[in-house]
Amino acid sequence: MGRQKELVSRCGEMLHIRYRLLRQALAECLGTLILVMFGCGSVAQVVLSRGTHGGFLTINLAFGFAVTLGILIAGQVSGAHLNPAVTFAMCFLAREPWIKLPIYTLAQTLGAFLGAGIVFGLYYDAIWHFADNQLFVSGPNGTAGIFATYPSGHLDMINGFFDQFIGTASLIVCVLAIVDPYNNPVPRGLEAFTVGLVVLVIGTSMGFNSGYAVNPARDFGPRLFTALAGWGSAVFTTGQHWWWVPIVSPLLGSIAGVFVYQLMIGCHLEQPPPSNEEENVKLAHVKHKEQI
């Protein structure tokens, strides 16, 4: 047992990445992979069973808990943004350096791409069997919607853009409230569960129009995977070239969410001077994070 522990310790030292930003990028990649793997996996189960193994509620529950698990996995290393819109908001508020925006976004998109690949491999036979060995983007036998979001038939581009804008703004307002230490902060350790609950609420109230992507990486990574896996360029042209809406609109919604929270709540909160005990706790926490 002693030799085994020593061997494990040595392996850990050899594999330890000293470049902190790279460690954070890897954490974002894995956290987003978990989010997409469980979230899109639930969609696959519902679609491929034609509704006999779940429904709208199970999909929303899966995405909510998937976000929670992703945050629990990556939170201590990177903050677990798992979403370029969240990273953009944090950079906009000067809580993160701007260099993290492209790096986190790339890592999150890669994680989403890999998560989609896992779901595709897991349900490979079922996907091909679903439409007699054909891959359709939309329609009664469409399977591309397992991985990325597409607008419902009733939705036009303007309404769809507004849908993603409001959904993301709501997400950012709630996230900022959850992490704000001066606004009834969530008990330490429960942030992940609370953010997962926010995603669940957004899904159950705003998911009808287009599936509430509210996350450019979660949508574009799997969409790119489907384009390469056999669905082709139709994943970008379907829905009046819908693909750009879940990228642009959430970023604009992120800015709106920041302004709404700061103008109506954040700028008006009293910030009492921290006691020595509180300051020590913060410093200890920062020191611990730096050693990861």
From Swiss-Prot:
User: What lineage does UniProt assign to this protein's organism?
Assistant: Eukaryota, Metazoa, Chordata, Craniata, Vertebrata
Q: Which GO terms describe its biological process?
A: cellular response to hypoxia; establishment of localization in cell; glycerol transmembrane transport; odontogenesis; positive regulation of immune system process; regulation of keratinocyte differentiation; renal water absorption; renal water homeostasis
**CC terms in the record's Gene Ontology section:** basolateral plasma membrane; cell-cell junction; cytoplasm; membrane; nucleoplasm; plasma membrane
What catalytic activity does the UniProt entry give for this protein?
Answer: glycerol(in) = glycerol(out); H2O(in) = H2O(out); H2O2(out) = H2O2(in); urea(in) = urea(out)
Q: Which residues cross the membrane?
A: 25-42, 57-74, 101-121, 160-177, 190-206, 243-264
Q: Which residues form a coiled coil?
A: none
State where the protein is found.
Cell membrane; Basolateral cell membrane
Quote one Gene Ontology molecular function term: identical protein binding
Q: Which residues lie on this side of the membrane: Cytoplasmic?
A: 1-24, 75-78, 93-100, 178-189, 265-292
Q: Which residues lie on this side of the membrane: Extracellular?
A: 43-56, 122-159, 207-210, 225-242
Q: Which residues bear the site annotation Selectivity filter?
A: F63, Y212, R218
Q: Which domain of life does the protein's organism represent?
A: Eukaryota
According to the record's subunit comment, the protein's assembly and interactions are: Homotetramer; each monomer provides an independent glycerol/water pore. Could also exist in other oligomeric states.
Q: Where is this motif: NPA 2?
A: 215-217
Q: Which residues, if any, are the signal sequence? A: none
Query: How is activity regulated here?
Result: Glycerol transport is regulated by pH, with the porin being permeable to glycerol at pH 7.4 but not at pH 5.5. Water permeability, however, is not influenced by pH.
Q: Which UniProt keywords apply?
A: Blood group antigen, Cell membrane, Glycoprotein, Membrane, Repeat, Transmembrane, Transmembrane helix, Transport
Q: What is this protein called?
A: Aquaporin-3
What family is this protein classified in? Belongs to the MIP/aquaporin (TC 1.A.8) family.
Source organism: Homo sapiens (Human)
